[in-house]
C-alpha cells in the first residue's frame, strides 16, 4: 500500500510539472515593487449544507471511548469578511455564525474494566457553531513582514441518539445493547501563530476585471501591462469607496468606469459593461511568492488538547490570464504534545478557471505526510493522506451566489485523517 501511495504521488508530481511547464500562456511579469491594493467588506447570509465524516477519541488508563460519525447539516449562515490589503499591511478578518438541524449515523466503542460496548447509532438534533479569525502581515519594508494570526471556533450539538449493539462484561458474557439517550457536545478550539516572512502575494481581483474588460470589449486595440494597471487603479478607487452597510449603486459606479475609459483611454463606452460590472466579485486571487516561519500553538478542549511548535510555509500564486490562476503551497510543522511529538507536512497544488466575470472552477490536490517522533511504537513510520478537491462558485446576479465544494480524504491507515468525502453547498445573498 505504501509503495503504491508513493508511486502515485511521484507520478502526480511529474504530471503537475509537465503541465506547469507547458503553461506558456502566462502573459504578465509583475515586478516585486508593483503593489496592488484591495479593500472590501462583505456581509453574507443564506443556507449552508455540509456532509462529512468526523471522529473523536478519549483515553485514560482505565477507559476508552471512540466514536465515528458521518453527519449532515443544513444551517442558516451569517458571515462577515473583511480584507484590507495596502502597501504596508495585509489584514483579513472573518466571522461566521451557523445554526440548523443535524443528523448522522456511525458507531462507537465504550471500553472499561467493567464492560466493553460496541454499538451503531443514529443521531438527530441541532448543531450551532461560530468562528472568528484575524490575520495581519505588517510590512516594515517592501519585502519583509511580521505576522500575527489568531483563530477560534466553538460548536454546540444537542441531539437524540439511538444505539444498537452488544455489551461484553468482564466475565466475557455477551448481551444485546439498545439505548435511546439525549446527548450534547460542546467543543471549542483556539490557535495562534506569530511569524516573520519575505515576499508578498498581490491581490489581482481589480487587475482581472480591467484585463477582462479591455481584452473582450476593445480587442481591436493592443493594451500594454501599464495601460491595464492604470485602469486597475481606477477600478480600485471606485470599489474602495463602497460601504457594506448602505450598499452601492452599480449604475453609478459603471458610469464612472466608462467615463474613465472615454476621457483617459479614449475608448467608446459600451452599454453592456454595466452587466459585467455587477459581477467580478470573487474571493482574492493572487500573484507572487511568500515564505514565512515562526512559532504556533493550538488548544482544543478534547484530546489532543494542547499542541505547540514551529512552522515553515511557502506560498506561490501565478496570475496566468484573466481566466487562469495557478496556486502552490508547501508547509511543514513540528508539533509538540505531552504524549507524542510529530512532524506534519502539506503540499498543495491547484488551478482556478474563471468563466467571464461570473463563475469560478477550482480543482487540485493536497498531499499530507506525517511522521511520529517519540512516545509511540510507530516512531519514524511515514503516514500519508491525500485530498483531491473540486469547487464551483457562481454569481447569479450582483447579490446572489452559489458556492459548491467537494473533496475526498484518502488515508491508508487513517492515523492522519478519517477517510471519506466532504461536500458542501452554500446559497446566499451578499452585501459589499
Question: Where would I find each of the regions flagged by the language model?
Answer:
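Detector for outer-membrane/organellar transmembrane beta-barrel domains
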Residues: 195, 201, 209, 265-373
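Outer-membrane beta-barrel "beta-signal"
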Residues: 189-207, 417-432
Amino acid at each position: 500500500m505504501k509503495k503504491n501511495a508513493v508511486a502515485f504521488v511521484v507520478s502526480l508530481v511529474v504530471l503537475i510539472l509537465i503541465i506547469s511547464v507547458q503553461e506558456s500562456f502566462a502573459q504578465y511579469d509583475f515586478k516585486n515593487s508593483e503593489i496592488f491594493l484591495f479593500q472590501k467588506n462583505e456581509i453574507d447570509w443564506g443556507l449552508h449544507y455540509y456532509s462529512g465524516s468526523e471522529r473523536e477519541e478519549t483515553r485514560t488508563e482505565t477507559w476508552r471511548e471512540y466514536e465515528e460519525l458521518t453527519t449532515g447539516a443544513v444551517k442558516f449562515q451569517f458571515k462577515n469578511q473583511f480584507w484590507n490589503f495596502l502597501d504596508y499591511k495585509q489584514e483579513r478578518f472573518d466571522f461566521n455564525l451557523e445554526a440548523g438541524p443535524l443528523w448522522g449515523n456511525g458507531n462507537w466503542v465504550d471500553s472499561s474494566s467493567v464492560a466493553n460496548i460496541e454499538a451503531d447509532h443514529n443521531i438527530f438534533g441541532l448543531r450551532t457553531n461560530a468562528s472568528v479569525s484575524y490575520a495581519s502581515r505588517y510590512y516594515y519594508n517592501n519585502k519583509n513582514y511580521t505576522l500575527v494570526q489568531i483563530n477560534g471556533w466553538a460548536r454546540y450539538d444537542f441531539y437524540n441518539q439511538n444505539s444498537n449493539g452488544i455489551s461484553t462484561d468482564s466475565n466475557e458474557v455477551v448481551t444485546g445493547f439498545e439505548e435511546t439517550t439525549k446527548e450534547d457536545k460542546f467543543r471549542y478550539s483556539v490557535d495562534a501563530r506569530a511569524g516573520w516572512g519575505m515576499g508578498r502575494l498581490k491581490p489581482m481581483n481589480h487587475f482581472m476585471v480591467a484585463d477582462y474588460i479591455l481584452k473582450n470589449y476593445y480587442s481591436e486595440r493592443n493594451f500594454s501591462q501599464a495601460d491595464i494597471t492604470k485602469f486597475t487603479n481606477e477600478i480600485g478607487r471606485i470599489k474602495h469607496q463602497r460601504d457594506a452597510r448602505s450598499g452601492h449603486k452599480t449604475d453609478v459606479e459603471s458610469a464612472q468606469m466608462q467615463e474613465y475609459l472615454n476621457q483617459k483611454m479614449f475608448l467608446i463606452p459600451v452599454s453592456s459593461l454595466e452587466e459585467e460590472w455587477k459581477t467580478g466579485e470573487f474571493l482574492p486571487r493572487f500573484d507572487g511568492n511568500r515564505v514565512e516561519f515562526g512559532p504556533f500553538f493550538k488548544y482544543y478542549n478534547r484530546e489532543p488538547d494542547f499542541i505547540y511548535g514551529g512552522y515553515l510555509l511557502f506560498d506561490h500564486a501565478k496570475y496566468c490570464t484573466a481566466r487562469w490562476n495557478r496556486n502552490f503551497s508547501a508547509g511543514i510543522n513540528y508539533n509538540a504534545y505531552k504524549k507524542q511529538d510529530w512532524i506534519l507536512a502539506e503540499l498543495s497544488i491547484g488551478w482556478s478557471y474563471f468563466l467571464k466575470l461570473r463563475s469560478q472552477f477550482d480543482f487540485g490536490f493536497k498531499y499530507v505526510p506525517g511522521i511520529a517522533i517519540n512516545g509511540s511504537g510507530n516512531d519514524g513510520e511515514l503516514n500519508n493522506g491525500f485530498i483531491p478537491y473540486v469547487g464551483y462558485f457562481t454569481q447569479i446576479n450582483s447579490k446572489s451566489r452559489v458556492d459548491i465544494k467537494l473533496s475526498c480524504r484518502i488515508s491508508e491507515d487513517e492515523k492522519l485523517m478519517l477517510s471519506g468525502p466532504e461536500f458542501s453547498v452554500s446559497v446566499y445573498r451578499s452585501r459589499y
